[in-house]
């Protein structure tokens, strides 16, 4: 299994680069940081067309994280870290991937 992490620094502005890299590197699982997009603007269709299922927690400006997988549907198991109920930043997402 090939797992990669990628600080995308704005997913919509770098979507072409991401799609090209996914095709070339063929990672099985990718963790993205700094999406810098709201949930409604996440490019789910483009990623599905590239063969990757995704879960994400978007946020305008600095934050936002996502997990991509070639193994089909991803089951989210946690969103955010315990211990700070006031933390509204999209910095952490956890999932189960069957693969």
Task: Identify what each model region corresponds to.
Residues 35-38, 44-99:
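Structured beta-strand-rich core segments of catalytic domains in phosphoester-bond hydrolases
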Residues 1-49, 53-56, 65:
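N-terminal, active-site-proximal structural segment of metallo-dependent hydrolase catalytic domains
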